């Protein structure tokens, strides 16, 4: 927050503090881009929440959800130039924004916990030699 103030760009950011449920969805839906430059995130559900309401997402390759999301931009968490380029591209190119928005929403809406459970079960069965 201090850095944003020092650079005189406070009008470009919103730091809402802790939010709940519907508040989170409303803020994400009003956002141009969601960024999760996580060093290590076992899964990280917040990019899925952003994508579900049509907010293009930038995530780190190191986050667990990077393995399942095809329609999020992925960078290394330490590569701030790549993150800045991704933000710029999403904001500058309407077709890219629209594509990430629509395809991301569709992708997340088609993720089913039941399907994930079946995949895990198949892997267990394969490893245990049960079929």
Regions found by a protein language model. Give the residues of each.
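A charged, aromatic-enriched C-terminal amphipathic alpha-helix characteristic of glycosyltransferases
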Residues: 95-126
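Short glycine/serine-rich donor-binding loops of glycosyltransferases
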Residues: 44-47, 65
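Conserved acidic donor-binding segment of nucleotide-sugar-dependent glycosyltransferases
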Residues: 72-81, 89-94
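Short alpha-helical donor nucleotide-sugar binding micro-motif in glycosyltransferases
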Residues: 18, 26-31
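Short hydrophobic beta-strand element within catalytic cores of glycosyltransferases
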Residues: 56-59
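Aromatic "clamp/platform" in nucleotide-sugar-dependent glycosyltransferases that forms part
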Residues: 39
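Nucleotide-activated donor-binding/catalytic signature segment of Leloir-type glycosyltransferases, i.e.
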Residues: 1-19
